[in-house]
A protein has these predicted regions:
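Acidic-basic catalytic patches of nuclease active cores, encompassing PD-(D/E)XK
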Residues: 1-50
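Conserved catalytic cores of phosphodiester-cleaving nucleases, focusing on short active-site segments
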Residues: 40, 59-85, 89, 97
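Short, charged, amphipathic alpha-helix that recurs within catalytic cores of restriction-modification
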Residues: 88-119
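Domain-level recognition of nuclease-like catalytic cores that cleave nucleotide substrates
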Residues: 1-3, 108-144
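Short acidic/glycine-enriched loop/turn segments that link adjacent beta-strands
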Residues: 55-57, 134-135
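A short beta-turn/loop motif at secondary-structure boundaries
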Residues: 52-55, 119-121
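Charged, terminal alpha-helix-loop-beta segments
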Residues: 50-51, 64
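Hydrophobic residues on conserved beta-strands that form the core of alpha/beta folds
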Residues: 47-49, 71, 127
């Protein structure tokens, strides 16, 4: 086989493996977010948004209970080989989450919002973080 033929074959394999990893990571993220959302529901929260996006960032899960609006960042890993998932929440990520939360609050308060706000208003906004390693969930409330 020619050298260029082998190079093309390697490029195709690399593209396929990249696409396969992307699908696996997407499925892992959805599984983790489903697990976290179910945890909040069991704890008596209403989920009012999932994967809410704006130019300032994305909010994985937004929940509500007893006057507290909770924004949860979800991190998922297949295993712990690459460290603690919570370490992936950098100061820059926290800033993006805070800015996205401000945009979310502004949108929920607008008349054109597609999000149904909870009855009453929140007195507090809390930021939680969730890590799912394999199938194990670890929650940290009020982390930043």
């Amino acid at each position: 086989a020619s050298r260029s033929h082998l190079a093309r074959a390697n490029n195709v394999r690399t593209a396929r493996s990249r696409a396969t990893r992307a699908r696996a990571n997407g499925a892992r993220a959805r599984f983790a977010e489903d697990l976290v959302a179910a945890w909040y529901v069991r704890e008596g929260y209403d989920i009012i948004a999932r994967n809410w996006r704006c130019p300032r960032g994305e909010l994985d899960i937004v929940a509500w209970r007893d006057g507290v609006l909770v924004v949860c960042e979800v991190k998922a890993r297949r295993n712990a080989d690459f460290g603690d998932p919570f370490e992936a929440i950098t100061p820059r990520k926290v800033l993006r989450l805070r800015r996205a939360t401000a945009a979310f609050v502004a949108e929920v308060g607008s008349a054109t919002s597609s999000i149904t706000p909870p009855s009453g208003r929140w007195q507090e906004i809390r930021f939680d973080a969730a890590a799912v390693v394999g199938t194990r969930l670890t929650m940290r409330e009020g982390v930043f």
